[in-house]
Amino acid sequence: MHPSSRFHSNKKTFVRINNAIRAKEVLVIDSTGKSLGVLPIQEAQQRAQQQGLDLVEVSPHAHPPVCKILDYGKFKYSLSKKEKDSKKGATKLKEIQLHVNINEHDFLIKLKQAEAFMAKGMKVKFNLFLRGREITHQDLALNLMNRLIKELAHVGQTDQEPKLAGRNISLTFTPLPANKRLLKYNLPETETTRIREENREKQKEKENTSKEGNKDA
């Protein structure tokens, strides 16, 4: 059984146990989860002592306060674990801005940023705002977003296709499980250069194909 004390999980949260509980009467829950009803604080403390356990105040603002008879050490560990799990579950979201006329070099930089974030388990949201007459280039903007899906498939995935909302197009990526994430753009310089050259060649091929199509038309 622990001495009278308070467990501080952070600056705002604490738990009173045993003789530190101030209420004169408390609603007591035993170690099996059964309610023992409202008892004088002395009797509640005695029952906990008889079982070699602690009286822990779990709902201090209830009327009367609710206390449980349990192993304080295990209770403290459980609280600590929940806090850690909660922090892990709070996935950070990083936002990246794009421009419809972005050049290949800047596009590669955006890919590297997104890949680095997702490699760390962070979500990434791309935003593209069409200014003024750029609204007439919706097809280019959507193609750019669809290209992102292909270029980042090795590290993340998106739940829905990019859609235009007013003048803004957004696309959110969720990182793949850690054991399935691969690096493509954040590699040693020699490998990155090779990939950059491959992307340039692909872009040239697309431009040439587009020009030939216009000639035929």
Curated annotation (Swiss-Prot):
InterPro entries: T_IF-3_C_sf, T_IF-3_N_sf, Translation_initiation_fac_3, Translation_initiation_fac_3_C, Translation_initiation_fac_3_N. The keyword Cell cycle does not apply. Gene3D superfamilies: Translation initiation factor 3 (IF-3), C-terminal domain, Translation initiation factor 3 (IF-3), N-terminal domain. Keywords: Cytoplasm, Initiation factor, Protein biosynthesis. The keyword Protein biosynthesis applies. GO terms for biological process: ribosome disassembly. Residues 191-217 have a biased composition (Basic and acidic residues). It holds the Pfam family IF3_C. Residues 185-217 are annotated as: Disordered. Its main location: cytoplasm. It comes from the Bacteria. It is found in: Cytoplasm. GO terms for molecular function: ribosome binding; translation initiation factor activity. GO terms for cellular component: cytosol; membrane. Monomer. IF-3 binds to the 30S ribosomal subunit and shifts the equilibrium between 70S ribosomes and their 50S and 30S subunits in favor of the free subunits, thus enhancing the availability of 30S subunits on which protein synthesis initiation begins. NCBIfam families: infC. Belongs to the IF-3 family. PANTHER family: TRANSLATION INITIATION FACTOR IF-3, TRANSLATION INITIATION FACTOR IF-3, MITOCHONDRIAL. This is Translation initiation factor IF-3. The lineage of its organism: Bacteria, Pseudomonadati, Verrucomicrobiota, Methylacidiphilae, Methylacidiphilales.
